[in-house]
Amino acid sequence: LVRQAMLEAADYRAALDRYENEKKKNPATATAPPPRDLKKEALLLVLERKIPVHIHVDQADDIMTAVRLAKEFGFSKLSLAHAEESYKVADELAREKVTVVVGPRMIVYDDDNRAVNLADYLHRHGVEICIMTDADVVQQPFLRSQAAIAIKYGLEPAEALRAITVNPARLIGLEKRIGSLEPGKDADLVVWSGDLFDVRQEALHVFIDGVEIYRSARVDGGVKK
């Protein structure tokens, strides 16, 4: 179905191009443009490599279908949500530079019922990962808890941090503005009382655009602006 939709969008683009060429040559004899189709116009953004493609998928065969579509139609960037069987094709995903957004299930089970820490497995096989909650399946405030689960079962804390900061920023093309602490980027940050991935810790300071908007009562009596 996806491939058919992409082919129809390509045909729509060709019809638009023919109309524009005819209109330039002789406006009086140009045929009517094709009826406007907003769905096809949305897919043109993909064909013209103006937006990335994010696909919800789980099974390995469907994952590889998505990879083939990306190669056939020249997607600018492909990312996969959930992708619970991505460990079966991790090497292929790494080779094609596909990002996997892991969650809400952080631990999956292989065909022999062995636990697989999906985020860690993919990272060790060279796949760029992000971690999500899939809100409202897991509520958004529990994002760091999702990352903590991956850490508990083997993912390096530094990679878990990247998976909820700079990696997703890069995935949506905003890495020059957000995702890490660097001069010139948005100064939005939280200072925690300890390890970010220890759920017993609390936020001490919250800064938005460099302005402190929250201070815990544990710090100088606390302040909210």
Q: What is each PLM-predicted segment?
A:
Residues 52, 91-94, 103-106, 111-192, ...:
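His/Asp/Glu-enriched, well-ordered alpha-helical/loop segment
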Residues 1-77, 202:
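Polyanionic/metal-chelating signatures
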Residues 60-64, 83-90, 137-139:
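Active-site environment of divalent metal-dependent phosphoester hydrolases
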Residues 67-70, 86-87, 119:
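Histidine-anchored nucleotide/phosphate-binding helix
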Residues 182-224:
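C-terminal cap of metal-dependent C-N hydrolases
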Residues 52-56, 66, 79-81, 99-102, ...:
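Structural recognition of the beta-strand scaffold that forms the well-ordered cores
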Residues 54-59, 75-85, 104-110:
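Catalytic beta/alpha-barrel core
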